[in-house]
């Protein structure tokens, strides 16, 4: 019986250790979730400011564009857009829409930082892009570089079509 008592006590101790380890892991996971949320907020603020700074310059260089900040359930960012009317002899006027929208998406369960962009030039979608990285591995320079690149590409596409 003594042997069984010892084995029973060891089994109980192993169970308690496993329970303690599981509780510690859950506490660590909650802490890391909090940290990931904090990081997402920090990155979102920095990148949405960069997006606004870049898109705010489009109306200065391409007259007729309007700048709009975006804060919605779809994300945080900005858009630059304009409407043109094309008049052709003997035809109805055609409204032409151009817009560049860039957003940092809300935090998802996958814990990634996601940048999305959609560009339309004269009623034709020119690109729709998404770039994301895990929050633990974010390289802000790659995001700001893509924002700059996509804004420049949109300006070039618009200038070529107008």
Functional labels for PLM-detected ranges:
Residues 14, 18-66:
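Contiguous, amphipathic alpha-helical segments that mediate oligomerization or scaffolding
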Residues 47-49, 65, 74-76, 94-98, ...:
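Residues at beta-strand starts and edge strands
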Residues 61-81:
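Long, charged, glycine-rich C-terminal linkers/tails
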Residues 142-146, 151-162:
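Terminal low-complexity "docking" segments
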